[in-house]
């Protein structure tokens, strides 16, 4: 499962 959330952007 891949969880992409707004906040992983450096």
UniProtKB/Swiss-Prot annotation:
Expression across tissues: Expressed in hemocytes.
Protein's cellular compartments: Secreted
Keywords: Antimicrobial, Immunity, Innate immunity, Secreted
GO CC terms of this entry: extracellular space
GO biological process entries: defense response to fungus; innate immune response
Main location: secreted
Superkingdom of source: Eukaryota
Function: Exhibits antifungal activity against Candida sp. but does not possess antibacterial activity. Has no hemolytic activity but may have been derived from hemocyanin.
Protein name: Rondonin
Native source organism of the sequence: Acanthoscurria rondoniae (Spider)
């Amino acid at each position: 499962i891949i969880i992409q959330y707004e906040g992983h952007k450096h």
